[in-house]
């Protein structure tokens, strides 16, 4: 089942590729202690006291336009972040008795959780093949209680009179306050095992929000861990450039591209890696790795990709691509090589071809309808957040995105993830078909990260790899590569994603 929010996903991909440039270099080792929630008597008078009543009937979704059949139990409405802004939420309880409570955090930044609810892991789905809402048999509510948020403020249906939330600090504060508001509505969930799962830029939200929750004395919750799907984890060179040749080689082995030209491409990449000193970095991608920071070269990469694309495709041969894209921009080079065999290549899933229409988006049209907004209790969405194309426009708030990425964002691997792993589980999932966030770059970044007293993983992926991928799981941190998915894993292979969650994160 391929359930995508099409235009909105395309928008997410474009902006998340750009944000990678904003991440700084990191080559340091960390050993810190997590700041725990204060549960002493001195702060007990601040503790959130759950109200003993059932879920609010006013937030119950009683119907959805065009949905046929029995609607599952759903709630939506607003959670107060502070006096002048509220975040829109959708909550779906598990259909089985479950002690698991997952908060899903969409990427972008500036893309609404409502999109994920309808297109990735919620109980109701809308897709290109199914433009009317229908039951999603692979919903995460099959095993967990689920919450989706339109955050940060300025995203989706969220409403208020405040300025956009544009910093990690403010977004973290808003999230903590919104979660307090949520627990007041649904007090029985406070004792459930809480996990934050973020996709793409949502990896930054999930890790930072986890630390904010653990530093909040008024929340007495059962926090358990963080899941990161297609996560943005490193600076641009590490995430996209240095390991591009390994990514291309892996795609070729999977049989998607370059079946007859892989040896030629491999030789060309070998030359370029040496010229750019990437080979010295790749030599450190060992298991275990030596226990000192991995040095990497730095370059200024040209942004004139459209010009380079035209030049590279003129003549349509591999040699012309390598000649046209000189220097060390191996990410763009890889992208254009794929275009030679698939002129409709979509970077969030390189297995898609010209038969897929990324511009046919029934979900955004549906969410902008007045009757749908009324059914979802989203009638308070501020007109200030509404473009000429509706609240969701292309699915994401690009004005908000630009404001967020103008701030310097530190990789979550520098400090936060190592601290979290001291007491909690962190699990990464990456897709081999994702050209937006290269799994090879994430693995390189992890091998340059020290957590729980050791740098990187010790066990080699090669010793564990199957036709489906591999999983490394050491010292409270796991990394899974799936060969079946691209950037939006929950919609592409929901069964695999569930297995990843249950085997590496949920316990």
UniProtKB/Swiss-Prot annotation:
GO terms for cellular component: cytosol; extracellular region; nucleus. It comes from Schizosaccharomyces pombe (strain 972 / ATCC 24843). Its EC number is 3.4.16.-. Residues 41-64 are annotated as: Disordered. Coiled coil: none annotated. It is found in: Secreted. It comes from the Eukaryota. Involved in degradation or processing of the mating pheromones. Its loss causes a persistent response to the pheromones. It may be required for stabilization of enzymes that are essential for zygote formation. May degrade the mating pheromone P-factor. Keywords: Carboxypeptidase, Glycoprotein, Hydrolase, Protease, Secreted, Signal, Zymogen. Residues 1-22 form the signal peptide. PANTHER family: SERINE CARBOXYPEPTIDASE CPVL-RELATED (PTHR11802:SF472), SERINE PROTEASE FAMILY S10 SERINE CARBOXYPEPTIDASE (PTHR11802). The active site is at 200, 434, 487. This is Carboxypeptidase sxa2.
């Amino acid at each position: 089942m391929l359930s995508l929010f099409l235009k909105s996903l395309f928008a997410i991909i474009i902006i998340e590729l750009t944000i990678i440039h904003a991440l700084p270099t990191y080559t340091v080792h960390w050993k810190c202690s997590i700041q725990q929630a204060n549960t002493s008597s001195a702060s007990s008078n601040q503790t959130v006291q759950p109200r003993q009543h059932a879920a609010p009937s006013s937030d119950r979704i009683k119907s959805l336009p065009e949905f046929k059949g029995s609607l599952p139990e759903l709630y939506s409405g607003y959670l107060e972040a502070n006096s002048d802004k509220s975040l829109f939420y959708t909550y779906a309880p598990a259909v089985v008795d479950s002690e698991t409570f997952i908060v899903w955090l969409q990427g972008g930044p500036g893309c609404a959780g409502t999109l994920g609810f309808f297109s990735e892991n919620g109980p109701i789905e809308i897709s290109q093949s199914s433009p009317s809402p229908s039951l999603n048999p692979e919903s995460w509510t099959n095993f967990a209680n689920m919450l989706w948020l339109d955050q940060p403020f300025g995203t989706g249906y969220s409403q208020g009179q405040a300025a956009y939330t544009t910093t990690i600090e403010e977004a973290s504060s808003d999230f903590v306050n919104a979660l307090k508001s949520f627990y007041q509505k649904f007090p029985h969930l406070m004792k459930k095992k809480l996990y934050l799962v973020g996709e793409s830029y949502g990896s930054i939200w999930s890790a930072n929000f986890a630390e904010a929750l653990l530093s909040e004395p008024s929340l007495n919750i059962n926090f358990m861990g963080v899941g990161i799907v297609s996560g943005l984890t490193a600076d641009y060179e590490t995430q996209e450039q240095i390991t591009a040749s390994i990514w291309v080689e892996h795609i070729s082995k999977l049989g998607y591209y370059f079946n007859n030209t892989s040896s030629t491409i491999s030789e060309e990449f070998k030359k370029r890696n040496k010229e750019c000193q990437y080979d010295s970095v790749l030599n450190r991608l060992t298991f275990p790795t030596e226990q000192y920071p991995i040095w990497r070269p730095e370059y200024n990469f040209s942004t004139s990709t459209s010009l380079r694309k035209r030049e590279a495709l003129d003549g349509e041969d591999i040699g012309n691509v390598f000649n046209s894209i000189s220097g060390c921009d191996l990410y763009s080079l890889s992208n254009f090589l794929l275009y030679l065999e698939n002129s409709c290549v979509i970077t969030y899933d390189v297995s898609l071809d010209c038969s897929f229409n990324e511009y046919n988006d029934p979900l955004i049209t549906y969410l902008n309808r007045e009757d749908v907004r009324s059914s979802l209790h989203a009638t308070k969405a501020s007109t200030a957040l509404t473009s000429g194309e509706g609240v969701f426009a292309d699915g994401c708030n690009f004005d908000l995105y630009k404001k967020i990425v103008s701030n310097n964002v530190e990789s979550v691997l520098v400090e936060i993830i190592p601290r979290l792993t001291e007491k909690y589980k962190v699990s990464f999932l990456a897709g081999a078909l994702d050209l937006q966030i290269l799994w090879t770059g994430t693995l390189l970044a992890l091998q340059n990260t020290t957590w729980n007293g050791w740098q990187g993983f010790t066990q080699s992926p090669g010793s564990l790899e199957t036709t489906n991928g591999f999983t490394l799981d050491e010292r409270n941190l796991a990394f899974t590569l799936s060969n079946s998915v691209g950037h939006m894993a929950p919609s592409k292979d929901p069964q695999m994603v569930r297995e990843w969650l249950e085997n590496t994160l949920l316990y």
